[in-house]
Amino acid sequence: RCLPESLDPKTEQNIKWSAKLGSDTHSTPVIAGGRVYIGTNNRVPRDPRQAGDRGVLMCFAEETGEFLWQLVVPKITTSRFWDWPNMGICSPVTVEGERVYVVSNRGEVMCLDPAGLRNGNQGPFVDEARHQTPAGEEPIPVGERDADILWLFDMIGQLGVRQHDSAYASILVDGPFLYVNTSNGLDDKHKTIEAPDAPSLIVLERATGRLVATDGERIGPRIFHCTWSSPARAEFGGQPTIVFAGGDGVVYGFEPLKAVPPAGEVVRLRKLWQFDCDPEAPKENVQSYVGNREVSPSNIKGVPVIHGGRVH
């Protein structure tokens, strides 16, 4: 679309605007509704009150590069293997209408207002000041350049997920539902799965953040490293399918939810099929093979891509 043949960041040749991020940026920029969203770290704080390591999601104006607002999330302090130093927020956002969905560095599925707090605190979540401040410190008051959290779902606190290194998920929107991989993975020593019963794939009600379904496959004990592969939606022979690659090297096909379950009910996703991408690999005590360069299980970290009726 009329892209230049070349560009030079040093001389700013063919560069419309640039914006300073942190020192490490693992997220993918997403452009929607005239805004640019990208996760980074806090090595170069935009808010002098927010000193130190944090996860950050920044929002800029697409046309001018003006900084609009940021989500600042304190680090998990349990150990570095929960929330690796200076990783920032690694997950890309998903934008649907006037809602922005993202998974924070603390394993929280968040719904944000794309306008930030410039148009007021919309709620129902209204404790942004406490949320953006490390535990034990006086809450940092919020302003117009801070994020407006509408709701959040804490996968660690509410599901017992043990994320590894960092949370990563590209949230899939399907009708009234959000499909999210949980980043459940290994312990600090890369030897065991601390949360074997925690789900690998969950479904939330998009409007409220309520948990409505889980994969129910108990993938946990078979996870070789972590659950970083995000779900995708496809249709095979007229059958809608949620395609999900587990941390056990198996690709699963689930039937999408058709209706929101009654209040308080969490259902199990119906599995349509599964395919083991490495059937000859070890299947028992898989974590004992970590570091083995000759024989080991496999896991999948990329998002499934569907084309021509095939999953890649």
Residue ranges, per PLM feature:
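Noncatalytic, solvent-exposed loop/strand surfaces
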Residues: R1-H312
